[in-house]
Amino acid sequence: MNTVLSTVLFAIGAYLIGSISFAVVVSKCFRLADPRSYGSKNPGATNVLRSGNKKAAILTLLGDGAKGFVAVWLVKHFGPDYGVQESGVALVAIAVFLGHLWPIFFRFVGGKGVATALGILLALNGWLGLATLITWLVIAYAFRYSSFAALIAAIFAPFYYALMFGPDAILLAVVAMSVLLIYRHGKNIGNLLAGKESRIGSKKK
């Protein structure tokens, strides 16, 4: 199979995997309100937690993280057999992330990408993902703001990658994901500056 075609097919598959919104699916399974209708209106684990159902929030978190991990893991392990190179892995990472942000199955209304980005980073390199996760945990524990922790982790992730592996195509993908994640947190940034951002564990209003 042609290398370019293989790369494109892996990327399309990754986008479709990313388009599965676990926040919406899990909420329906638990007969909860659509997460796009309350709280931050973001279909993500933090907003599902505002429903008061911790199990649903955990499943959402795991699902969103798993889809990022699986998409990148598949191309890393099977892509080389079809000629997919490092740039192809970078493209797949971006594709699954874009699927989460703008899912074709849910009218292109998706989440902010925190859990999916973490899954992607873990698949790219375990130490990279772990360093980014620890950054999030430390900031979240200290300040109790999930969004603020995500922003700080997003800023540090490219630096972690650059320190570990230097400049390459995957670094560009990590930078792109960080920029998109920060962009998707625009409203949260405004709320943080205004002192109106919801803290971790707060219930929906």
From Swiss-Prot:
The gene is plsY. It is found in: Cell inner membrane. One of its GO terms (molecular function) is acyl-phosphate glycerol-3-phosphate acyltransferase activity. Pathway: Lipid metabolism; phospholipid metabolism. Catalyzes the transfer of an acyl group from acyl-phosphate (acyl-PO(4)) to glycerol-3-phosphate (G3P) to form lysophosphatidic acid (LPA). This enzyme utilizes acyl-phosphate as fatty acyl donor, but not acyl-CoA or acyl-ACP. The chain crosses the membrane at residues 6-26, 55-75, 89-109, 120-140, 162-182. This is Glycerol-3-phosphate acyltransferase. One of its GO terms (biological process) is phospholipid biosynthetic process. The lineage of its organism: Bacteria, Pseudomonadati, Pseudomonadota, Betaproteobacteria, Burkholderiales. Signal peptide: none annotated. It comes from the Bacteria. Belongs to the PlsY family. It catalyses: an acyl phosphate + sn-glycerol 3-phosphate = a 1-acyl-sn-glycero-3-phosphate + phosphate. It is a multi-pass membrane protein. Its EC number is 2.3.1.275. Keywords: Cell inner membrane, Cell membrane, Lipid biosynthesis, Lipid metabolism, Membrane, Phospholipid biosynthesis, Phospholipid metabolism, Transferase, Transmembrane, Transmembrane helix. Probably interacts with PlsX. GO terms for cellular component: plasma membrane.
